Amino acid sequence: IAQCLVGSEMCIRDRCSSYVLEYLSNYFDITVFYYNPNIFPESEYTKRILEQQMLIGEMKGKHPISFVAGNYDREKFYELAKGLEHLKEGGERCFKCYALRLEETARMAKEAEFDYFTTTLTISPMKNAEKLNTIGAKIGEKYGVKYLQSDFKKKNGYKRSIELSNEFGLYRQDYCGCEFSVRDRKQESTGIKKK
């Protein structure tokens, strides 16, 4: 993998995954594309974007890491979630949300002539890497930009992300980001079951 990827440029759809940046910056010039219209409330969105920018400013990789913020298109997220609000995290609503964000990343990668695009979401034990990779590959074909398949949580990737978060003093959220995951977390913490 290193031989064919060195020196390439990559666009990453990110939510502050330190390990992914540490690892991929050995092989790519990286642009972190922060596109997360699902995040709720707006103060949480702002908090996460500032954390991402701080990390990029402090983290030194073998190759450059830059940052681009996408639009905070909350209405797009609510359009895709319509009728799926009742579903728990990890279901069809999430898959549509992955596709929305990966589609925007691929569009941006195509427009800026990146060699690859990927997502950091596979670092999370709560995310289905196989589903993310299937969605990413399909969108990559549509846009003519290679999708870098991954499961960053493996080979101690998730463990390393926690170590780096502690090292850099990063904020680690306890929910995915959307209003519905906030609701689910509150219900779990109070023991209330959804009907």
Enumerate the predicted regions with their spans.
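Single conserved hydrophobic/aromatic residue that forms the stacking wall/gate
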Residues: 1-7
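Nucleotide-activated chemistry modules centered on ATP-dependent adenylation/adenylyltransferase
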Residues: 8-9, 13-195
